[in-house]
């Protein structure tokens, strides 16, 4: 037994969920959630995106990121593993605003998409105004390609710096 570890448990009905408490201060999530609609975003089929992220991430070691290139009409996912293995897939998207190239960890993308209970997902590109640091992206549900968010689900992801690719 480790005396330095603390657990928290939540019980609802006949289910109990336990979690390890992490020391430190939890970041203020509200500062990362915009109060108004984000003008630049892509709409993609949720299941197609999950499947593609899973496939291209098969060539990656551990928790390496996937390069995501959002262009007019398509999203290109690319994964590289030390120049030995690589994978690439393209998905149709509806893009509003300028294209974007970001790098995301597949595990976190799939975790975020697991909460989307609609046919389509909106990936919004926030702009924090710092060109030296990638701005967060917001994943939310969307009932149809041309519809607004269908529920209140929002998931914030922080991209990684793109180095050498």
What is each of the regions a protein language model found here?
Residues 1-22, 35-165:
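DNA polymerase processivity clamps
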Residues 28-31:
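Specificity-determining recognition surfaces
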């Amino acid at each position: 037994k480790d005396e330095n570890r603390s657990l928290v448990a939540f019980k609802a009905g006949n289910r109990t969920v336990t979690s390890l408490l992490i020391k430190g201060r939890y970041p203020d999530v509200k500062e990362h959630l915009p109060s108004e609609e984000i003008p630049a975003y892509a709409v993609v089929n949720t299941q197609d995106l999950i499947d593609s992220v899973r496939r291209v991430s098969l060539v990656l070691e551990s928790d390496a990121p996937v390069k995501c290139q959002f262009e007019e009409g398509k999203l290109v996912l690319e994964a590289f593993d030390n120049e030995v293995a690589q994978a690439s897939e393209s998905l149709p998207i509806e893009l509003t605003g300028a294209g974007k190239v970001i790098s995301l960890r597949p595990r976190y993308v799939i975790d975020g998409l697991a909460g989307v209970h609609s046919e389509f997902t909106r990936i919004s590109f926030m702009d924090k105004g710092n060109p030296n640091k990638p701005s967060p992206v917001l994943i939310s549900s969307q009932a149809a390609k041309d519809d607004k968010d269908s529920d209140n689900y929002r998931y914030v992801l922080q991209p990684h710096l793109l180095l050498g690719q």
